[in-house]
Amino acid sequence: MIKKFKENYSIILLFSIILFFHQYIFQQFFPNNRGYIGHDWEIFLPYLMFGKIWFHNNLLSIPWFSPSFCCGNPFFADPQTMYYSLQQIIYLIFDPLISTKIFFFILSVFGYLGTFLLIKKGFKFNNYVSLLCAGLFLFNGFFVYRAIAGHVAYLSYVFIPLYCYFLIISYEKKTNHIYLALSALLFANFFHSGSGPIILIIFTSILFVILLYSHFTNDFKIFLKLFQSSIIGTLISSSKISASLFFLSNFPRQYPATEFDSLVAFIKTFFLSFFITPNQNYFNESLTSMFPFGLHEMEYSVSIVPIILIFFISKKFFTLNFYNIRFILILFIIIFIPIFLNINFFNQFQIISKIPILNSTWVQFRWMAVYILPIIIISGLIIQNLNIELKKKKYLVLILVSLLLVQNLIKDNGWHLNDQKYSIQNAINFSEKLKQGISQEIIGPAVILDKSGTPKKSDNKNDMFFFSYSPLMCNQAIFGYGLENLKTKKITFNSKKILQDNSAMYFSNKLDEKDGNFMFFNPSCFLFPEENNCKPGDTFTILDKEKLIKFSSYEKFEFKQNKFQIITNYVSIFSFIICLLYLIYHFFIFIYNIRKKY
């Protein structure tokens, strides 16, 4: 009893120490000492602040459109928006600065604890090995440096271990469907938290984890449970998925996919990015791309620990038998997929460019993220199978944890600090206005031009809505990185204001008329043009004046949807309610049994 208490105490202490150092190292980026956060927060922080206004005015009603960006555009249908998500709840409660810190902390805990539970309860490794694996995942660069850069849509990646844990437990406890319901909700969360752009990477990562679990347990029936979970989760999020697909179909885009020059370049980049530190110059020189990438894009670090563990591989892994051959085949599949998508060996990129969804993604090296969890699981497997006494295993884990912490403590993060260019102050000031109960309304469209008359380069394009104007030159990748698919010429400006830096702000009132149309896009035309008798990029007509006034005041307005979207709306809400009621029912049963027992 005392021995078990001491071990649990040691695990909790070590667990807390690892988490403390993680937060100590990375909370300094939220914000940095100049009050800035990562550049892509420019997109997502305004999204979350819009969600705050929408909730105040409309509670849980679907935010189909937003007047805050692009002079009116679809919001719910954007795969990267996240109104029904954990992060939106956090930003509803706290001010932007505190919310950003809490958000990073909560995601860290979910990823950390989820991995510990997955390795401990799912893969049945001991406490210390599970803790090391959890630590490796906590510090992985794909999570940490995407959070710093503001790639908020990618951060739901951290829920993969927790999802896999729920799925495995639901399979092992076949009569208990609580974990299946939890896994389905978590699967739906991948869509609703804005992870649409990397949903294939997330699902492939899940497949790899479950494939390794099936191999170790010599039982592949869990894939039926994965099918059930993903189907229920897809039903819950079917409204979001359907709307996103309709939006994307109206604005198809295909950019040339990134491609490594050779297998050697891919392997070298992988090795440096995962185990040492990325080489930005080498990466960009060996990659064919539309433009060079920042250091944050090549950060996947799981530390040098997995490399060290190679020297501890047990001889039994080299025995030629069916079990090991199957394991090698699984590893080959895991290794091959990112290589296949990054190096055009067989001219397969032509085929990939014709595959729906896959052809809309072009930054293919992000597929390296699917390596993270297999590397961590195999690292744990190596230690778990060491033929040494448990005490020595504990000491080995402590040494490896120390290496993990030291490597992250001494790492030069200067580039990431200097790359943070988005000021959070506008959002903080806007949040104060909301607290004071000041009603919000968009006055009209606006754009800022520099002295040469071209759109001014800015790190806070979407912030304009904090000042009651909707930016025409917004940050919305669906319209193209240069907004080439947005009919910007339909918006004209009647007023001009010279700013302090001699740039000029051109703006109009939304009710200014031109040829029977107002100066604001009708967002329903971007999403359901046929049903609303218009074309993508059409503006509100003078007959739609009441709709425009409601829309610009963050109120719902009437528009038509196609039949399939209406069906998926009902499917989503009923699936969610059934799942939620099932969990609530079992929660009350659980409470009742506790009270009855004591």
Please annotate each region the language model reported.
Residues M1-F5, K121-F125, I168-L180, L212-K225, ...:
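Membrane-interface junctions at the ends of membrane-embedded or membrane-associated helices
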Residues M1-Q27, K225, N321, I567-Y598:
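Start-transfer (signal-anchor) and selected internal transmembrane alpha helices
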Residues Y9-I17, D219-L245, A257-A265, R326-I335, ...:
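Hydrophobic alpha-helical membrane-interfacial segments at the cytosolic entry of transmembrane helices
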Residues F15-F20, V109-G122, Y128-E172, N176-S214, ...:
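Membrane-embedded helix bundles of polyisoprenyl
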Residues I17-Y112, G135-A147, H151-Y157, L263-L287, ...:
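Membrane-interface coil-to-helix junctions
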Residues F20-F29, W54-L59, I90-F94, Y128-G150, ...:
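Membrane-interface helix-loop junctions at the exits of transmembrane helices
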Residues P46-F50, H56, I236-S314, I438-S439, ...:
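Periplasmic/ER-lumenal interhelical loops and adjacent helix-loop junctions
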Residues L211, L235, V302-I339, E555, ...:
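Hydrophobic, aromatic-rich transmembrane alpha-helices
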